Amino acid sequence: MGQKVHPIGLRLGIIRDHRSRWFAKAGEYPALLAEDHKIRAYIVKKLASGGIADVDIERKADQVEITIRTARPGVVVGRGGAGIDELKANLEKLIGRRQIRINVVEVQRVDAEAALIAEYIVGQLERRVAFRRAVRQAIQRAQRAGVQGIKVMVAGRLNGAEIARSEWTREGRIPLHTLRADIDYAYKIAQTTYGTLGVKVWIFRGEILPGAGGPAAAPEEVAAQPKPDQRPRRRKKIQYEERTDEQ
């Protein structure tokens, strides 16, 4: 089942944390869930050039706290904080909430984030770069960032072919069945002249060992953890005794 389910959803509560953290009454859950979707969609669309890796949302009474993980904090904050003020005002109009707090967190290892790698591939495909070249360059960037494995799948009318197909490339290990494996996953859509292309990216950043880190541990903490002993075990020698049939 590790090959079929969402890699992040499978690890929720084990090594990953939820992107939306709040509780509400039974009748309010659908409206608040739709509100979270609107917030994320607006931020991703408004800050398309900001390299948004993830958006976390927390709710406390009437206050909504939004944490934006981005590769370009300067684009999000703007000159003198003007970008944050404008974003906050627009979100208040969108959801009708009075108190909105926005935190901006810079991503340390940009090329170790699946969302940013997928966004890079989408940008190359929309500029009519050959998909194999775009995938190869993305894999090289991820390997330079120190990831232990990466898998990229592109589907659609590749290079303008009449029949749609899917191709994938993998470098390193992607242990989808291992729950302690820190695997990041992202899915993006590229709008090309021949139609839409789907891009999926899996990145294996290492294992989170028991006691070494909790849910949503940073990639830097995962990389600093010691690797388990991988020395091959010696097989025990079996002694055989020669037996002769004596009459």
From Swiss-Prot:
Which positions fall inside the KH type-2 domain?
39-108
- Where composition is biased (Basic and acidic residues), the residues are 238-247
Keyword Nucleus belongs to the record: no
Entry keyword set: Ribonucleoprotein, Ribosomal protein, RNA-binding, rRNA-binding
Task: Specify residue ranges for compositional bias: Low complexity.
Answer: 215-227
Stored SMART domains: KH
Q: Where is this region: Disordered?
A: 213-247
**Gene Ontology CC terms:** cytosolic small ribosomal subunit
GO terms under biological process = translation
Report whether RNA-binding shows up as a keyword of the record.
yes
UniProt cross-references to Pfam families, sorted A to Z:
KH_2, Ribosomal_S3_C
Q: GO MF annotations for this entry?
A: mRNA binding; rRNA binding; structural constituent of ribosome
PANTHER family in the record: 30S/40S RIBOSOMAL PROTEIN S3, SMALL RIBOSOMAL SUBUNIT PROTEIN US3C
Function according to Swiss-Prot or TrEMBL? Binds the lower part of the 30S subunit head. Binds mRNA in the 70S ribosome, positioning it for translation.
UniProt-listed HAMAP family: Ribosomal_uS3_B
Report the sequence similarity comment from the record.
Belongs to the universal ribosomal protein uS3 family.
**Whom does it interact with, and what assembly results?**
Part of the 30S ribosomal subunit. Forms a tight complex with proteins S10 and S14.
Q: What is this protein called?
A: Small ribosomal subunit protein uS3
What organism is this sequence from? Gloeobacter violaceus (strain ATCC 29082 / PCC 7421)
Gene this chain is encoded by: rpsC
